[in-house]
């Protein structure tokens, strides 16, 4: 099967002879809002101007929709949000996930600055940082990554998107993130910065870029960030290093870019996540003050990632373009790890036994895409075909471990109790890995966007065929499976400022390898999650509104770790179940509303987002191998976020800003016996820009969690596992940047 897929790049290339013969030489007349079609030549592909004066740079319209190509977010038949470099720089979040989760109500982060375990939730489903793509290449961000220095834009595609972006080697549901790297601007980039963050962290940054050549064809840009010191949480410190180098060439028909990215973050006391709260027979104890650490400072973790990639665009014909790339990421997450676990009462927790752990990820990613356009009578066609391959090797080594753990009582001074824990783990490592797997994913995608009635009606048909290979190198077991994921999208554009859209898409996750009684090794077909979505966008001139509704269904599956006394054991003995087999369903239904504006002569920029989410499970296997019905854990029912920026009339160059985020209550168990309480966070800030001769000085500051709210940042794991991290306390920061 994979030998056939390996020939797909040749098939893609051969498609051009037909496309060239069928092309019409005339350049079609373009209207501003009707740029949704994937245009193949350089001028049209790059013509991604903003279609609304409400766009202030934070929510740019130009997005990369994978196999569909570069399009306009306003007219896209799926829900996508794009945060550009300006937005990330203004928030000055210490991690990428903290930055992109600031405004959109259907997206919230786990980890980030509060914990070294890092990722996002889309509509109630988890996406780990290692599943982010960079420049369209999957898996290039790195495990538990937090770096932002290389990010020119971060694009959030909501909903099942396997057909659009391909399947991550480890599977993902309900969303994807693509990062576009920074490139040198025409006018050059010359910026240095200094920053301070509470409790006592210093930061230095640089951004240097220049273009060369008669038409500025060649560009080089280097970025760096160093941050070191103590966070506002006691016993939690970080040493952060981020560097990025981009070199690009943009010719008349060919554009090529090379990126090299390095990031390393060392933390002490930064992994205090409370686990398996669903097992408690009482409500979890109240969140302590944000400055309180639930883990000792000697528990240290490191994340390190190195990425090198090459990408290109070639305008092969007037009406057809080839794009592609190849990248390699080498990432590690290592240190001494413990897993604090709530006790049965919910009023105390077990500190866990810290253990030396080294997780290593090596990912090779490549793709080749062809896209173009032609017409058949009154119908326009924007076609695309893409081949993707991802290889990931994942290895985990473990070493010495604490001999015992302790029960910690939060009603008594926590630091005093943590100080009594034995920090002498030893230094011995087991030379045999505890996990050693290789996952390979080959896929071929095709799509055609048909335009009717002067492109007022648009129908996208297509899908992606994917073949997954998985090998366990410890026991030699290997298996493969494949599936075709269809894609159906539609958009109605009755007028240039109104778009009504809908879609059906799927997400895939690899199944477990199973050995039958006769010794035959197999892998079940990939697990399929299905999404239906409808939405409407309206451009009112100085503000834009989006309203959409969605449903996502994801199959459950048996953990299969028990032999008696459970629903799984009974069904296995009856021949009705095995470890990893599908059982039951979890369903998320929701409504989202988002709006952003640019008012008062572009001096007032408010944003608002609201999501209502219902997450339920039916006949769903839990972590204990029993079937449950009820709500899915740790998913807030209501999330609302509002923000504003105001360019003050009384002080030229002064901008004031603020954000309010509300997270409704969620539940720590499927039976709704015990709830995580709701909470509201408030941030305020200011930015002042002034001229120093020919240079520009920008001074920014902010207070995050202004009212020092104590709260649990909830998370969910596999099955019905519910986790929580103590939210960060009030945090101050100040930075100055000089453009010269």
Q: Which positions does each model-derived feature cover?
A:
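Acidic, small-polar-rich N-terminal luminal/periplasmic segments of exported/outer-membrane proteins
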Residues: 32-187, 534
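Transmembrane beta-barrel wall of Gram-negative outer-membrane proteins
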Residues: 189-272, 298-315
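Transmembrane beta-strands of outer-membrane beta-barrel proteins
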Residues: 190-192, 218-222, 256-258, 322-324, ...
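Face-selective signature of the C-terminal outer-membrane beta-barrel domain
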Residues: 308-331, 353-474
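Membrane-embedded beta-barrel scaffold of Gram-negative outer-membrane proteins
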Residues: 311-315, 321-327, 331-337, 526-599, ...
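Structural signature of Gram-negative outer-membrane beta-barrels, strongest in the C-terminal barrel
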Residues: 361-363, 380-392, 433-555, 598, ...
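Conserved C-terminal beta-signal and adjacent last beta-strands/turns
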Residues: 382-383, 502, 530-532, 632-740
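Gram-negative outer-membrane beta-barrel transporters
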Residues: 453-456, 551-553, 579-670, 737-739
């Amino acid at each position: 099967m994979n030998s056939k897929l390996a020939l797909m790049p040749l098939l893609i290339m051969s498609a051009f002879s037909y496309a060239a013969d069928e092309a019409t030489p005339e350049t079609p007349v373009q209207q501003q809002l009707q740029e949704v079609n994937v245009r193949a030549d350089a001028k049209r592909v790059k013509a991604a101007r903003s279609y609304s004066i409400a766009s202030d740079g934070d929510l740019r319209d130009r997005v990369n929709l994978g196999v569909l190509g570069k399009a306009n977010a306003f007219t896209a038949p799926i829900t996508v949000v794009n945060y550009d470099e300006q937005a990330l720089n203004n928030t000055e979040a210490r991690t990428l996930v903290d930055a992109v989760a600031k405004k959109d109500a259907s997206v919230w982060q786990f980890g980030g600055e509060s914990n070294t375990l890092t990722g996002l939730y889309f509509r109630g489903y988890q996406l780990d940082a290692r599943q982010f793509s960079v420049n369209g290449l999957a898996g290039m961000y790195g495990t538990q990554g937090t770096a932002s220095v290389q990010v020119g834009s971060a694009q959030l595609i909501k909903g099942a998107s396997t057909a659009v972006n391909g399947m991550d080697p480890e599977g993902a549901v309900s969303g994807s993130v693509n990062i576009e790297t920074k490139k040198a601007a025409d006018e050059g980039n010359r910026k240095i910065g200094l920053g301070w963050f509470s409790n006592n962290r210093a930061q230095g940054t640089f951004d240097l870029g220049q273009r060369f050549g008669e038409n500025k064809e060649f560009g080089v840009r280097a970025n760096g960030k160093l941050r070191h010191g103590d966070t506002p949480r006691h016993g939690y410190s970080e040493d952060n290093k981020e560097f990025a180098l981009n070199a690009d060439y943009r010719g008349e028909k060919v554009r090529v870019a090379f990126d090299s990215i390095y990031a390393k973050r060392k933390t002490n006391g930064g992994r205090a996540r409370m686990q398996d709260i669903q097992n408690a027979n009482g409500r979890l104890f109240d969140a302590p003050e944000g400055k309180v650490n639930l883990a000792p400072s000697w528990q240290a973790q490191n994340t390190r990632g190195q990425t090198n990639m090459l990408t290109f665009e070639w305008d092969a014909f007037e009406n057809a373009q080839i794009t592609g790339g190849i990248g390699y990421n080498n990432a590690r997450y290592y240190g001494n790890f413990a897993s604090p676990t709530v006790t049965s009462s919910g009023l105390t927790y077990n500190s866990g036994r810290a253990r030396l752990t080294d997780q290593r990820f090596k990912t090779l990613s490549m793709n080749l895409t062809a896209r173009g356009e032609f017409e058949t009578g009154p119908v326009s066609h924007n076609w695309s075909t893409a081949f993707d391959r991802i290889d990931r090797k994942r290895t985990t080594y473990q070493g010495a471990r604490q001999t015992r753990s302790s029960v910690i009582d939060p009603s008594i001074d926590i630091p005093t109790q943590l100080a009594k824990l034995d920090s002498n783990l030893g230094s011995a490592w087991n030379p045999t890995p505890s996990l050693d797997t290789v996952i390979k994913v080959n896929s071929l995608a095709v799509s055609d966007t048909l335009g009717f009635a002067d492109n007022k009606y648009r129908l996208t048909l297509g899908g992606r065929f994917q073949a997954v290979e998985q090998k366990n190198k410890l026991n030699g077991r290997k298996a493969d499976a494949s599936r075709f994921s269809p894609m159906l999208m539609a958009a109605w554009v009755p007028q240039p400022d109104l778009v009504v859209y809908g879609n059906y898409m799927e997400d895939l996750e690899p199944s477990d390898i199973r050995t039958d009684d006769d010794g035959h090794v197999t892998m079940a077909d990939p697990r399929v999650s299905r999404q239906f979505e409808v939405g409407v966008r309206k451009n009112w001139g100085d503000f834009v509104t989006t309203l959409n509704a969605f449903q996502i269904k994801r199959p459950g599956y048996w953990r299969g770790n028990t032999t008696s006394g459970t629903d799984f054991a009974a069904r296995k003995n009856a021949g009705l179940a095995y470890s990893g087999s599908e059982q039951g369903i979890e369903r998320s239904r929701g409504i989202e509303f988002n709006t952003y504006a640019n008012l008062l002569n572009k001096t007032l920029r408010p944003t608002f987002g609201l999501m209502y989410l219902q997450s339920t499970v039916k006949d769903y296997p839990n972590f204990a191998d029993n079937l449950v019905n009820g709500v899915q854990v740790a998913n807030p029912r209501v999330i609302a976020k509002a923000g504003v920026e105001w360019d003050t009339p009384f002080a030229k160059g002064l901008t004031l800003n603020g954000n309010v985020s509300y997270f409704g209550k969620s539940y720590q168990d499927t039976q709704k016996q015990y709830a995580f309480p709701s909470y509201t966070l408030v941030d305020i800030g200011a930015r002042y820009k002034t001229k120093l001769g020919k240079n520009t000085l920008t001074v920014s500051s902010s207070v995050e969690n202004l009212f020092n709210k104590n709260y649990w940042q909830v998370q969910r794991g596999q099955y019905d596992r519910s986790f929580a991290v103590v939210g960060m306390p009030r945090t101050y920061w100040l930075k100055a940047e000089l453009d010269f």
